[in-house]
Amino acid sequence: MKTAAKAKSRRSEPAEQTPARTVRQRILLVDDDAGVRGSLHDVLVEEGYEVIPANDGQQALELIATSSIDLVLLDLNMPRKNGWDTFERISADHPLVPVIVITARPHQLFTAVSAGVGALLEKPLDISVLLQTIARLLAEPVEIRLARLAGRDAPFRYAAGKTDQASKSRGSPATPP
């Protein structure tokens, strides 16, 4: 994971990416790596988000049960309660909360898409792509979120944050270029 200082130099100015927010949206940041959590926390706070950190899936489930969360940024590979188990519980208990999963294992893409994940991003993260993905998911209509979770014809996303229209029309998961 790049440091917050390096990450800041790679992204665009906030005004170019997202409209001004009057209410701070809350992001639950779940990663067992304190360095990753700290770097992402700093970047997201600078962008105007309120960030609630969690060390693992169990802590994330406890926090989302007692807090109002707008989006979850979830590492898949964690000890104790892994990201997949955590995602399944979040999507069952809080289906309107979009989840972005992050992983160092790109082969998990197809499983993530078929599971109804809002987006999957590969480590090391490109901060500008992360910020664009967060903004897009927070602005996404509720019907799209519900359709994705129900496995209906919702746009599929992959690591670059694009939609694969050809696979959508075939009814299969998006494939990277």
What residues fall within each predicted segment?
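Two-component/phosphorelay signaling modules centered on CheY-like receiver
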Residues: A34-I52
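Short amphipathic alpha-helix used as the core "switch/output" element in two-component signaling
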Residues: E62, W84-L96
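Alpha4 helix (beta4-alpha4-beta5 surface) of REC/receiver domains from two-component response regulators
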Residues: D85, R105-E122, Q132
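Receiver (REC) domain active-site loop signature in two-component systems and cognate sites
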Residues: M78
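Active-site residues of response regulator receiver
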Residues: D75
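Acidic catalytic/metal-coordinating carboxylates
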Residues: N55-Q59, N82-D85
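Non-catalytic signal-transmission and effector/linker regions of two-component phosphorelay proteins
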Residues: M1-R26, S128-P177
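Hydrophobic/aromatic residues positioned on beta-strands within the core alpha/beta folds
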Residues: I100-I102
